[in-house]
Amino acid sequence: MRTATIKRKTKETAIEVTVDLDGTGASNIATGIGFFDHMLDLLARHSRIDITVKAVGDLHIDYHHTTEDVGIALGQAVKQALGNMAGITRYAGIHLPMDETLTRVVIDISGRPTLVFKAEFPRDKIGEFDTELVREWFNAFAMNAGVTLHVETLYGENSHHIAESCFKGLARVLRAAVAIDPSAAGEVPSTKGQLGG
């Protein structure tokens, strides 16, 4: 079973995340941030990864700590669930359309955390959610999942559509990259014999 549960508690947030990489896309998300919950629901649905997130944070200040800390915990959960990464497909990429928006997302489950994020949002907020937090979440996730992740919105006019295309794009590449490659015979997909470093 490729599952993991991460609990993270700081003075700012208390978070519990559970993932099942071989799930059906079921989700149970409660962060107290409506738009963010919507994005995480999409992530679960389109990745086919079961995701449970329970987060209590200092939302009376702003959404930054909760958003970032959920990214940290979810990244850690995915990394833990992958184990030694034997047999995974490892690489995946997609061009993901969302109406007038087109975003390219490419992933390498490399064990070498890197984020290249190029998306410009026409507005500073989507509802009450600061659009700059989209990048913050992706950075926290990539650094803690140990993945190389490139996210680039090629064009788009609607901030909601841009954010949604980024999350859906990540979902689809995660789905492909964590999948077991039947031809790999359980081998780690690296000439080094291990991933990371």
From Swiss-Prot:
Record key words, sorted: Amino-acid biosynthesis, Cytoplasm, Histidine biosynthesis, Lyase
The reaction(s) this protein catalyses: D-erythro-1-(imidazol-4-yl)glycerol 3-phosphate = 3-(imidazol-4-yl)-2-oxopropyl phosphate + H2O
SUPFAM superfamilies: Ribosomal protein S5 domain 2-like
HAMAP family reported for this sequence: HisB
A matching Pfam family: IGPD
Pathway(s): Amino-acid biosynthesis; L-histidine biosynthesis; L-histidine from 5-phospho-alpha-D-ribose 1-diphosphate: step 6/9
GO biological process per UniProt: L-histidine biosynthetic process
PROSITE patterns: IGP_DEHYDRATASE_1 (PS00954), IGP_DEHYDRATASE_2 (PS00955)
GO CC aspect terms: cytoplasm
Signal peptide: none
Entry's transmembrane regions: none
Places the protein is found: Cytoplasm
Top enzyme category: lyase
Enzyme Commission (EC) number: 4.2.1.19
Protein name: Imidazoleglycerol-phosphate dehydratase
Family: Belongs to the imidazoleglycerol-phosphate dehydratase family.
Molecular-function GO term, any one: imidazoleglycerol-phosphate dehydratase activity
Upper taxonomic lineage: Bacteria, Pseudomonadati, Pseudomonadota, Alphaproteobacteria, Hyphomicrobiales
CDD domains cross-referenced by the UniProt entry: IGPD (cd07914)
